[in-house]
Amino acid sequence: MQRPFLLAYLVLSLLFNSALGFPTALVPRGSSSSNITSSGPSSTPFSSATESFSTGTTVTPSSSKYPGSKTETSVSSTTETTIVPTTTTTSVITPSTTTITTTVCSTGTNSAGETTSGCSPKTITTTVPCSTSPSETASESTTTSPTTPVTTVVSTTVVTTEYASTSTKQGGEITTTFVTKNIPTTYLTTIAPTSSVTTVTNFTPTTITTTVCSTGTNSAGETTSGCSPKTVTTTVPCSTGTGEYTTEATAPVTTAVTTTVVTTESSTGTNSAGKTTTSYTTKSVPTTYVFDFGKGILDQSCGGVFSNNGSSQVQLRDVVLMNGTVVYDSNGAWDSSPLEEWLQRQKKVSIERIFENIGPSAVYPSILPGVVIASPSQTHPDYFYQWIRDSALTINSIVSHSADPAIETLLQYLNVSFHLQRTNNTLGAGIGYTNDTVALGDPKWNVDNTAFTEPWGRPQNDGPALRSIAILKIIDYIKQSGTDLGAKYPFQSTADIFDDIVRWDLRFIIDHWNSSGFDLWEEVNGMHFFTLLVQLSAVDRSLSYFNASERSSPFVEELRQTRRDISKFLVDPANGFINGKYNYIVETPMIADTLRSGLDISTLLAANTVHDAPSASHLPFDIDDPAVLNTLHHLMLHMRSIYPINDSSKNATGIALGRYPEDVYDGYGVGEGNPWVLATCAASTTLYQLIYRHISEQHDLVVPMNNDCSNAFWSELVFSNLTTLGNDEGYLILEFNTPAFNQTIQKIFQLADSFLVKLKATWEQTGN
């Protein structure tokens, strides 16, 4: 029997990923596309994987380390405004902020009448506007001759500490007094005369390293001195105004902005009496901030640099079509506000419905506390049961995305897990009766925590792994919240939870990862990508929970070996998950050449679940892996024509996805397959996680340049002419926070939103 895997309300929890709070300055979701032009960043070498066992399916460089030498590339569109070095004079209107750290000292008299002094650091933030004088304006016309220098004088006051006086106490000891002093300071920001002023787009940090020395006289009349190094790092972001107009390109230029930082330095020395003395001096540090306006995009290759050393253009797609269906149209009005409002409403409803399906429930009183039902439906179809997989994914979503995960519900779920592990079922005896873990592979249970004994697809080996992942997150939450577990349940500490529940599920993975089982759709018995990847993730996550004394234990060594074995098995072409015949991940290789194509949304679900945080990036098949992204492309391509709901005449935006192209399950029986909320949301989640990863980690976008490097996703869904740039096995690298990067991220955002727009429109049409 087939089943839909998760109730629709549970699936909607995946929508949480669409509201991750990306920086709007980096990703202007609602703005139209514009041209991107830049050139000439320096290249740096590849970085290796952080784990020796994790060999990927493709060679993907890390965010900032790439091989080869540089060439020039630009991103543009015939309908967009080119940002290039130009003869236009523009106004720099964004202020820059300079932070000065100084030391402030003051004096006071103690109870013995002695004068004492104390010092503390002080940080002064000064705004230095990179702007033209009020008389200048930015016009939409070009200049024919160099302009005069524009110098802006900014006056401010620096609070510093100065030497005041010395005095001699009764015992002959000399004390020094310091006073706080206000020093008027002038910063000059100069935009040098030039016939070509180019857009300032990057935050440019400047670091000044200097050595500061000072002298002082101790009570014996000796002169002491001390020196210390000091590093001053200042970031001055600038941007051009909005009324720009370009005519013709010229060579990139570099603009220097000169200013002076006035600060107070301190140093220490030891006098003849062995005492440590401190002296302060005021120091003016001339500083020049240099803005190089030529950075942007770099081409490099898998095996060698492009032979063409001239510049080339990569054009972003304005419209994406698949068999006549508009996936997204950048030229049309793309207003994300209605979608955002709908997502916020739906998130609230989704959380409410999820908790209604977890016992104790006022809506379904027969559900025991901690039991998660797959669906409230009890006839046509009857899914009023609990599945290990569904329960774990539900709890995982609650802990990961709910502001209030309801700790008592989590503890009740742990209690259910504890007892199900120790309950006999059709696969064998519970772990309370034997050390054999085979019974943990039973996927389906009654809502009263008794075994379901009717025929079913057994075993399903992903359940214990998914349960481990969810419970490890619960352990983290308990530790962070400081929750007292009390004596109500059979575990009184997080150590008990790990030893009495998680350890047994890990033992199951060690014993049975290389054994056949049914897939997550409960249809095919074999070895499956989804099962293996979540098993790998569970083992990998668990290793950080062992204390120092356990890390050399035989059990932990078994876990490490299992991690190596699963990783190697997944990426070995001989096992078929990566197959030269296909440009996507194969879910179940044993049927790929006979019953199915192997294309399956479960591969995206696996990547989304395993790579939900940057800490898992060392595991294979990350969300930026070309194999994962190309799988999404092929799912869209195949399912566009399968389902009538994707007919362009019914809805002009987006593609609804199903489980796999050959699916004939309609939610109750065998007939005609259909799209699923779970599958469509999974596609959005993959892309949102891709965006979030690059922004939060400040990673460059790395795009393979041809089919040998697997670029179907990029060439068919993002760029319009990627395959025409050359035949070498190359990469297109879009540096973080450049115009090329930001506008490409916007395209991916539109593609991700298109799936939810499709979902929203369909539900509104049907009244859901």
From Swiss-Prot:
Matching entries from SUPFAM superfamilies are given as:
Six-hairpin glycosidases
What are the start and end residues of every segment in region (H subunit)? 349-692
UniProt keyword terms in alphabetical order: Carbohydrate metabolism, Glycoprotein, Glycosidase, Hydrolase, Polysaccharide degradation, Signal
Tell me which Pfam families the record gives. Answer: Glyco_hydro_15
Q: Where is this region: Y subunit?
A: 693-768
Which terms does the UniProt entry file under GO BP? Answer: polysaccharide catabolic process
Signal peptide, first to last residue: 1-21
State where composition is biased (Polar residues). 49-66
Give the Enzyme Commission number. 3.2.1.3
Region (Disordered) residue ranges read 29-83, 125-149
Query: Highest taxon of the source?
Result: Eukaryota
In what ranges is there compositional bias, type Low complexity? 30-48, 71-83, 131-149
What family is it from?
A: Belongs to the glycosyl hydrolase 15 family.
What is the recorded name of this protein?
Answer: Glucoamylase S2
From which lineage does this chain's organism come?
Answer: Eukaryota, Fungi, Dikarya, Ascomycota, Saccharomycotina
